[in-house]
């Protein structure tokens, strides 16, 4: 598994959208957000397929309405799993790896290593 590390914040990046602080992260809220298969896939792909920059929801190539994706990304942000920044009309996201590891050691590695059950 590749090394999972925090994405550096570029100079001049906009402030993050509202999110819970590290000490406000609750395990049941984080696990609730990750219990949706699409959200789990979003987080896993952000962890494993990312480069050193934030990604828009279009990067994933999901065949879903934009309103549906917006809902899922908002749920992940409000649970404290991802951080989003507004760049013009785009919202770009990355996983809050450092914050999640500080609060729930080992959780990020579990999500990264997860494989769906065979159907």
Question: Predicted regions: what is each one?
Answer:
Residues 7, 68-70, 94:
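Short amphipathic alpha-helical "recognition" segments used for binding
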Residues 58-81:
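Canonical helix-turn-helix DNA-binding module
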Residues 29-65, 87-99:
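N-terminal helix-turn-helix DNA-binding core of bacterial DNA-binding proteins
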Residues 53, 67, 80-83, 107:
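Amphipathic alpha-helical interaction segments
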Residues 36, 72, 105:
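Conserved acidic functional residues
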Residues 54-55, 72, 112:
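Short linear functional motifs in flexible/disordered or boundary regions
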Residues 2-30, 44-49, 86, 96-119:
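Amphipathic alpha-helical dimerization/coiled-coil segments
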């Amino acid at each position: 598994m590749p090394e999972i590390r925090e994405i550096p914040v570029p100079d001049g990046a906009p402030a993050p959208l509202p999110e819970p602080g590290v000490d406000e992260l609750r395990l049941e809220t984080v696990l609730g957000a990750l219990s949706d298969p699409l959200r789990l896939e979003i987080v896993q792909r952000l962890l494993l397929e990312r480069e050193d920059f934030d990604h828009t929801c279009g990067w994933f190539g999901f065949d879903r309405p934009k309103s549906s994706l917006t809902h899922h990304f908002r749920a992940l942000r409000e649970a404290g799993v991802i951080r989003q920044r507004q760049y013009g009309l785009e919202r770009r996201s990355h996983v809050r790896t450092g914050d999640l590891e500080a609060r729930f050691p080992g959780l990020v590695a579990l999500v990264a290593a997860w494989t769906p059950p065979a159907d």
